[in-house]
Amino acid sequence: MSRLTSRPRLLVVGSPSLDLLHFKGRSVRSAGGAGLYTGLAAQRAGAEVTVVAPRPDPMPPALAAADRRLDWRGPSIPPEALPHFEIEYLPDGRTVYRRAVRGSEGDIRYGDVPDAGPGAFAYVVPLLDPELQLGFARRLSEAGVRVGCGTYAPGVRQHRDVVLRVVEASHYFFCNAEEAGLLWGSLDEVRVAPGRVVFVTRGAQGARVVLGDRPIDIAAPRVDELDPTGAGDTFCGTALARIAAGDHPAIAARGAAACAAQTVTGVGPAALLVDDPPPLSPRDDRVRLDSDRIRRVAGVIASAPEATAFDFTGPAFPEPGDPATLDYFFAGTAQQFGFWLERDGRYEAPMVAPLGGRALKGSDYLWAAFRRWAAEAPDQLTPAGQATLGDADFDRRLRDDDGRNPLPAGPLHPACARGYGRDMLALGLTPASLLAEADASDRPLARFLSLLDCVGGYKEDPWRKKSALLAAILSQRPERFLRFGDAEDVPPIVDYHCQRSCLRLGVVAVADEALASRLAAREVLSGDDEEAVRAACWEAVAEIHRLGGRPMGAVDWFFFQNRTRCPEMSKPDCPACPADPACAHRTRLFQPVFRTAAY
């Protein structure tokens, strides 16, 4: 989903192997090993991969195709010294290791690892000796490398305490549901420190991504499984490559699930040795993109004077140079969601409330209330102040002229504030230090977004609406707090105004009449219904941005200004809309009505 400025690099510490597989009444000899599957999957997903492991000389024919795709570094060994595994897959889903020969795996040395530099990514496979894996993970992490690790059930049973230390040393930890149960007790108890991520693969049930304490479930494509070997490692390599490229972990996991599903339809790593691009994440075909309409709307935005980036200055915003500016925007943007009222399972009206003698709507109200908050108690907007904020205190700071907090999402707001503050404190970050860390990267925007993927109030949304909005604000303010690297731009900022515009313009088309009827009736939708619309709108806006050639900040401001031209409660003012000649005028459609803290 992200735009690559260069191919990400992944180091894989772990040896390929030569295996004997038993499945569905068949016995097959195959190239294998976690290092091989992980490396090939990452390479196919766009990464440059270096595998660190003893290298056989001569190269066995079974490994020759993989060797051509990977940068395999390590001391020479005879082929018979490679690890060997004999694995049986039982009809009930269990895996039995009949034989495991460690071979040269124990000969991997840290000195063989090339200098990757801070910010690089590495994966340490689940070595037969978890202490060896732990040593690699710790040393790589100390060198500033983003480290992923995996495990295997027998290793957890025999060395649970060591594997838990591996979890602590990992930025990204991969396991299956059985292993998660052995480590944490159950899937629902999986938790790690802020800034850490656990991926739990669940076979046909998909995967769970846990960002610190926040779980996000991912569906898996349905396929006819032939050989399950390497599914978890394929997932791992794809996910790490996509995270290194800039994707949110949950979006990376969707692509990883699609690649893992394809891998199990063949024997061994065959699906990873093709030149075709990796499979796309499944799309809900109830909502489709209209390519012709997208092209026409992109043409309008390319030349429309209304498509200009907003600088986020004015009466509701801090003056340039105000010392509270960063805290105002970091804490305030996390609260930019849910400005609408519901009654009897349907959308009732947008939120409008009096403040300073003026009736202000939704986002405008929030910014004005936060401006007052910054004047009254600026220390409360710092991470430390947000972390300890009580519900009553939040209500008092957001009070309208009648003395009440009018925000319709209720307790979601103070909970969001505390999540933001607590994660920032746990990570040792302030808004200024987070920006400094991003600025030190050769891809500042990508690093900025990945840091927010660790912070409450932002991390929960795979589509990064609030993260992208904050990036746009900080780059467009007069202070230019955030710079972008070459070819970097913010991802689509898809809120409910944007979705309403996309539906009515016709850049996305609802092919399912039942869903279209629910949208038109403004009914509260299920999560699956909402996701179908929002994901399609995200893709449509990304394509409008690509075709139109305008910065995403300008594209976003065009869509946001459409909230007045094509509003929620009154007839659209089509003559005032620059996109009117390209519009499908599907004005009966309405944005997904779905209560979320994402937008």
Model regions: which residues?
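HhH-family (HhH-GPD) DNA N-glycosylase catalytic core used in base-excision repair
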Residues: L280-Y599
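Conserved phosphate-binding/catalytic region of the ribokinase-like
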Residues: L4-R7, V190-P279
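A short, aliphatic-rich alpha-helical micro-motif
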Residues: A116-G117, V167, V192
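Short beta-strand scaffold segments in enzyme catalytic cores
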Residues: L40, F85-E88, G206-V210
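Conserved beta-alpha-beta core of the PfkB/ribokinase-like small-molecule kinase fold
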Residues: A122-E189, A204-A207
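Active-site metal-binding loops of divalent metal-dependent hydrolases
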Residues: G14-P16, A34, T234
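Alpha-helix C-terminal capping segments
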Residues: G39-E48, R242-A245
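Conserved N-terminal subdomain of the carbohydrate kinase-like
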Residues: R7-R9, L18-R29, R44-V124, R138-R146
